[in-house]
């Protein structure tokens, strides 16, 4: 999902969707365009979601600016912004990935890298309670 997106039209601010996610949103256009490409940093103590991921990921071209909730675990960030944040809601796990999962901000280099498949498999297993 695009968080607030173009002109803030995502409409998640103040909704149950925002309530269950480990991040909050500004009530405005939250896109951060990075046409030069950026590389994310991950915490030194690797979370199981990051198993099989390289230390430096292929570049992305932008992200949605979000704010980690106090109880969120941010495992990937860029310039202080949470890119991959984890949380819980009732009996389940939640996750926010603040960039694209398809070609646009997710560069062709990233989409075609073997780590892309590894990341998404790990995320699905984590959310299903089968990892970590």
Identify the function of each model-found stretch.
Residues 3-81:
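An acidic, glycine-rich "communication" segment
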Residues 1-3, 7-12, 16-17, 65-132:
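A glycine-centered loop/beta-turn motif at secondary-structure junctions
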């Amino acid at each position: 999902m695009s968080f607030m997106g173009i002109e803030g039209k995502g409409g998640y601010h103040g909704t149950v969707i925002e309530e269950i996610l480990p991040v909050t949103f500004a009530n405005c256009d939250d896109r951060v365009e990075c046409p030069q490409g950026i590389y994310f940093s991950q915490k030194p103590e690797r979370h199981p979601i990051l198993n099989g991921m390289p230390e430096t990921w292929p570049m992305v071209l932008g992200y949605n600016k979000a704010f980690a909730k106090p109880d969120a675990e941010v495992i990937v960030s860029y310039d202080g912004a949470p890119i991959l944040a984890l949380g819980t809601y009732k009996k389940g796990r939640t996750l926010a990935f603040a960039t694209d999962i398809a070609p646009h901000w997710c560069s062709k280099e990233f989409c075609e890298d073997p780590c892309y498949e590894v990341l998404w498999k790990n995320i699905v297993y984590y959310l299903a309670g089968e990892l970590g």
